[in-house]
Amino acid sequence: MAMENDELKNLFTSALRRIIGKGISKKYKTLIEKAQKKRDTAPYGEKPDAVKTHLRDMIILPSMIGCVIGVYQGKDYVSVEIKPEMVGMKLSDFSLTYRPVKHGKPSIGATSSSGFVPLK
């Protein structure tokens, strides 16, 4: 998927444009190269193997579309399949480092008003 630089600039925020303008470092380039290599060697119709990385601040570029990247979240790796809608976002946006809290019903000792909760 070939995109012109002007089209890419419209997808990125000003902060991302500044980061891209400085240039992509070697560690990001090697991640892109590994992901593209896995994508190109995968059999037709199958997902490529995940490329594991700790680079959560990597900006998703159009050349990464179709790749599967394992993003480290502190304990294990979360597989993220790169889609066109993800261009311009960071890998960390798709791999939460915490579990959202699911609040249950109050029980005895939770608050002073929980004394009115009927017991089983």
Curated annotation (Swiss-Prot):
GO terms for molecular function: RNA binding; structural constituent of ribosome. It holds the Pfam family Ribosomal_S19. The keyword Metal-binding does not apply. The keyword Nucleotide-binding does not apply. One of its GO terms (cellular component) is cytosolic small ribosomal subunit. GO terms for biological process: ribosomal small subunit assembly; translation. Keywords: Ribonucleoprotein, Ribosomal protein. InterPro entries: Ribosomal_uS19, Ribosomal_uS19_CS, Ribosomal_uS19_euk/arc, Ribosomal_uS19_SF. Belongs to the universal ribosomal protein uS19 family. This is Small ribosomal subunit protein uS19. It comes from Naegleria gruberi (Amoeba). The lineage of its organism: Eukaryota, Discoba, Heterolobosea, Tetramitia, Eutetramitia.
